[in-house]
């Protein structure tokens, strides 16, 4: 999992809140061009995809992190005056198509579908293809799926190369797709051929 039980409970921050902080309260409406929120959404998707695609067992979503629930959970107890205020998940956030939570929820569904499309995915070893700390690029394969990540907040690459098995590659899941709140910088219809 990307987020532990303790992070989502009172006294700590959820992963999305660590990435975006209070900006998610004021800048999570679609079309709001806030760099902190935009970067946090991108990282949230990539962190979850790296985690889900490198595991050898089950992938655990914890109480709303699949759509970036902003607040912690605090069950009624003596220390909070037996309050129910934070003893809930706000599922209405992911259902609201005017807010960015739906991007994260839709991405989560597509990510799970992609991983399930690969037969015996969790039994297939992860094979590192490339990593470059300076470029902040990571690539690995799992079965027939090639995962390529650009973690740089400021650099996009055209014609970036690394060695992969001979063949033709097409994009089946793109964290930068506009459908998931990305910039849409990749041509998802393009077939990438090895040379």
Language-model features: locations:
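Carbohydrate-interacting/catalytic domains
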Residues: 36-45, 50-61, 65-195
